[in-house]
Amino acid sequence: MKLTFRIEYRTAWGEMLGATLCGNDNQPIMLSTGDGIRWEGSAEMTDAPAGIPISYRYGVYRDGQCIRRESGTMPHIFCPGKKRNCHYILDDFWKDLPQESYLYSSAFSGDYQSANSIKTMAPADCSITFRALCPCLHHKHQQLGVCGRGAALGNWDCKQTVLMEEIQANEWTVTLNAASLEFPLEYKFVACNADTKEVEEWEAHNNRLLCIDGMKKGEIYLTPESEVRFTSSARKVAGTAIPVFS
C-alpha cells in the first residue's frame, strides 16, 4: 500500500521534515515542500496486517540529524484495511502533548481494554476516515460519535449518529464511503451513552468543515486527529482560601 504524509509546519532555513513508522527512527521518510510550510512525502509499505494500528510521527531534520520530534507518548495512528493496493493519504497537524494532557492519563480516562480486532476499516474504493482524540469518556460510560450534514452522517439527527471505535486509548476513528458524503461536509463530534447509543452531549466546538475534491479509486483520506472537548469534561477545581495576616 502507498502512504502519503501531509502536514503544515513552518521550518527554518536548512530544516526538513520526515516521518518515521512504528518507532523506526533510523529510517525517516523525508518530505518535501515548495514554501517551507506545507510538507508532503510518500512511501510504500508492505505486509501490513489488516485491523492492526500502525503508529508514526514527524521530526525536524537538519544535516541528516533529527533536532526535534513530536511527543512520543501519543504518536499518530491509523488502521489499514483488508484491501491491497490502496493509497492512504494521512493529513496531520504537528502533535505535541494535548492541551490538557492530564486528562489522557488512566486516572481520568480509565483503563483502555483493547479489542481482539479493529472493525473500522475502509469499506469502499474511496473512503474517508475521521480521527479524533477524546479522553474521559470511559468514566462517563460513553463512546464518541459523529453527526452532520448529509444522509451518511444523519442530517444532524442525533438518532442517526455514526458511532466511532476506540482503536487506542482515547483515539477514536470511523471510516465511511466517500461516495455517500456531501462536500463541503459539516459535522460535529458527539458523546453517546455506551449502552443506549443515545447522544448525551455535543462537542463544545463550531461545526467542523471538510472539503475534498476529486478522490481517485483506491484512495483513503484520513482527517487530522482533532482534539475533542465536551463542556462536562471541563476542568473543575475546588479549594479553600486561607487568609494570611502579617
Model region roles, listed by residue range:
Residues R62-Y112, C192-A238:
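Structured interaction patches on ligand/partner-binding surfaces of diverse proteins
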